[in-house]
């Protein structure tokens, strides 16, 4: 069999030219000094309108773009903000819709303000070190954190280095924090199940090294204690796999349970699968309530009753707080966004 040969045509392909227009070339084209061009491109308002227009016209003709690093030395601004997610890329870019919703909220606000979003994942020690060097090295104007774990020291380190910080999930930091009403949302869910006549209400709690995991478990315990009911607890890590495993554990430990509050919709999806495998009907045998109201909740079988938290609004609120910090304004130390119970067919 004859081998096909590669066909080439023309000369070698070269990369883009490395010589970029300089301030001096713009100044010569505009007929002004280099200092005048520098003031115009750095946004200073002390330049006469006619000179500014001449500089802008010359820059457009030459295709001049200000060098970001050099400009930041003058303005002390990079016009970019980092969002750090202390998870692995595999977790952030998975079927967990919490992260894309937060990113979308942050990006929409920063884009409207003319700022760039820098996304960093720090699921390993090496990634955390890289993020630390990047942020404290002056590459961004501020850092936002979401999905924080107790052991994560980066927020405190950033604050000590003078980096503006906004977080979701660690209210004890000396930085603005955006969170949701975990307690109120969970208590509404448990009270709904009690009103339905459910007597043995279990929970699949979230990770206990996160504020969301602890607060939702606290809300569950408080609501059951008020009704003089016993807590039945298994713990997951906000993944579907952990919800499946925790539900199997609950059925083995408490076969008579008739309801379960699951601390995330993704874990609830896994719990529903475990209930089907065990031959339990939902909501006939066991009622199920989740937390998040991500798109998955409407696709579950049956559609999931859940506590809606405004995930994209968490991102938008974080970005707005950061923009206010960067402008030198005061920001509320703690913002709590409301939750609401969305009733569907699983309970």
PLM feature spans:
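Hinge/beta->alpha junction and helix N-cap segments in small-molecule ligand-binding domains
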Residues: 88-99, 119-128, 178-188, 204-248, ...
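Short acidic capping loops at alpha-helix termini that bridge into adjacent secondary structure
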Residues: 199-201, 228-231, 282-287
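Periplasmic-binding protein-like
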Residues: 140-146, 202-204, 234, 254-264, ...
């Amino acid at each position: 069999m004859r081998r096909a040969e590669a066909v080439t045509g023309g000369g070698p392909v070269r990369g883009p030219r490395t010589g970029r227009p300089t301030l001096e070339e713009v100044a010569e084209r505009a007929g002004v000094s280099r200092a005048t061009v520098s003031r115009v491109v750095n946004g200073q308002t002390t330049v006469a309108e006619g000179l500014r227009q001449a500089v802008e016209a010359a820059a457009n003709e030459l295709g001049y773009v200000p060098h970001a690093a050099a400009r930041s030395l003058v303005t002390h601004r990079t016009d970019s903000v980092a969002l750090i997610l202390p998870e692995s890329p595999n977790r952030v870019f998975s079927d967990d819709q919490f992260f894309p919703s937060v990113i979308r909220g942050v990006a929409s606000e920063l884009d409207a303000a003319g700022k760039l979003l820098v996304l960093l994942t720090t699921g390993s020690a090496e990634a955390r070190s890289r993020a630390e060097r990047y942020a404290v090295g002056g590459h961004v104007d501020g850092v936002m954190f979401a999905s924080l774990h107790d052991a994560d020291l980066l927020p405190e380190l950033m604050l000590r280095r003078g980096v503006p910080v906004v977080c979701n999930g660690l209210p004890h930091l000396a930085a603005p924090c955006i969170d949701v009403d975990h307690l109120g949302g969970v208590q509404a869910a448990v009270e709904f199940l009690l009103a339905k006549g459910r007597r043995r209400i279990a929970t699949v709690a979230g990770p206990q090294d996160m504020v969301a995991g602890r607060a939702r478990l606290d809300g569950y315990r408080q609501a059951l204690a008020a009704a003089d009911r016993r807590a039945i607890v298994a713990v997951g890590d906000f993944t579907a796999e952990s919800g499946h495993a925790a539900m199997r554990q609950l059925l083995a430990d408490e076969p008579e349970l008739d309801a379960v509050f699951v601390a995330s919709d993704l874990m609830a999806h896994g719990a529903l699968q475990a209930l089907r495998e065990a031959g339990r009907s939902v909501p006939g045998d066991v009622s199920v309530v989740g937390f998040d109201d991500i798109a998955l909740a409407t696709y579950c079988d049956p559609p999931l009753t859940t506590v809606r938290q405004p995930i994209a609004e968490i991102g938008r609120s974080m970005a707005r707080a950061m923009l206010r910090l960067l402008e030198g304004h005061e920001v509320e130390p703690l913002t709590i966004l409301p939750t609401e119970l969305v009733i569907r067919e699983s309970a």
